[in-house]
Amino acid sequence: MEKPSRNTYIPLTIVGECPECREYHRGRECPECGQDLRRPRLRPQFGGRGPHTLFYLEKYDWDTMKAVRRIAQALRKHHRHFGIAGMKDKRAVTSQRVTVRGVPPGVLARLRIRDLKIVPMGRARRKLRPGDLWGNRFVITVRGAKVRRLPEALRTVRELGGVPNYYGLQRFGSRRPVTHVVGKYVVLEDWEKAVKTFLTLEYPRESPEALEARRWLKEHWGEFKEALRRFPKFLDYERHILEHLARHPHDYINAFRRLPMWIRRMFVHAYQSYLFNRILSERIARGLPVHRPVEGDVTQDGLPTVPLPGFRTELSDGPQGEIEREVLEEEGVRLEDFEIKSMPELSAGGDRKPALLRVYGLRAEAIGDDTVRFTFSLPRGGYATTVLRELLGSEGVYAD
């Protein structure tokens, strides 16, 4: 198993990502590019009356789900009462709309949580769901940028209307990109390897305490009671697994079930995304276009697509189909493996995604010799780091 494709990395210091990362629910069109943003719209379910309160959440250095859980804890509500339209990057100033059921706006307005800003906006008839998000607007300042190739790159992106639609590093874990590795073992139903990878696979960007604990457990696999004592408290998900293994040392499948459902599903989705990136990389390497289809392609809105493999996936024909079959064979997985019989709730039917990510309203402003501010909008599911990589290049180094 490889690390995520180098296409997902950027060798830059991002000073401020998404300071105004607003979902375009308010207006009819993007002020930057005129793109109609009314599909889907928030009205009429969002506004007026209803059992849900719609609020605006601005956060910094918080995972979206951890921020929601912290707010839920402060309100003494279950996190399932909350609705979000999408996940936002942790290491950025991000803004998004959230709903919560049964909490008056005045109560929300009085909440004070560090690095979280909560502003009530009104009532809603139902909770927010991922389908309610058109996309995001990004304002990103990059220092240490090599701007020499930027004019040509901007011209290419504008001519194509976008960039290759890679999944960004966030999909795999920015500091510890192991989710796709765990996901492969989940798909293969090798529960011990899935658990061992999640607990012990080291990445240098972690804290010294976490690295030391993982290294010790890797060398003393099976000594779970002592590992529980050594793993720091902030590794709460790892500790949930270790608590189970300390009592039931060989029950790896139920230890894995100690993780929340959304995390367990995230592993499978990350592996699907890894396969998508591999297939897309090979398509480009073979000279096949991403902005127009060739014979055998499965298309969506006139664009060629790449599969997120699953047990219902129908592979392409022609040269694209050859690539898809070769990558699956090299990985040692079959489409039917995504029907996970021992944990069926994680089964993945599969999907397809365009090979091209549309970029709207792209602008670049030089600030000094080596600093650039980019402004652009992406549909939901698009990664800003993917756009930056195409504009500024990558040597396969993690972003700070």
Curated annotation (Swiss-Prot):
Keyword Transcription regulation: no
The keyword Chaperone is assigned to this record: no
Keywords of the record: Isomerase, tRNA processing
Any one GO molecular-function label of the UniProt entry: RNA binding
Domain TRUD, chain residue ranges per copy: 162-357
Coiled-coil residues: none
Pfam families hit by this protein: TruD
InterPro entries with a match to the protein in the record: PsdUridine_synth_cat_dom_sf, PsdUridine_synth_TruD, PsdUridine_synth_TruD_CS, PsdUridine_synth_TruD_insert, TruD_catalytic
Active site per UniProt: D89
Record-listed E.C. numbers: 5.4.99.27
Gene Ontology biological-process entries: tRNA pseudouridine synthesis
Catalytic reaction equation(s): uridine(13) in tRNA = pseudouridine(13) in tRNA
Physiological role: Could be responsible for synthesis of pseudouridine from uracil-13 in transfer RNAs.
The family this protein is said to belong to: Belongs to the pseudouridine synthase TruD family.
PANTHER family membership: PSEUDOURIDYLATE SYNTHASE PUS7L, TRNA PSEUDOURIDINE SYNTHASE D
Protein name: Probable tRNA pseudouridine synthase D
Native species: Methanopyrus kandleri (strain AV19 / DSM 6324 / JCM 9639 / NBRC 100938)
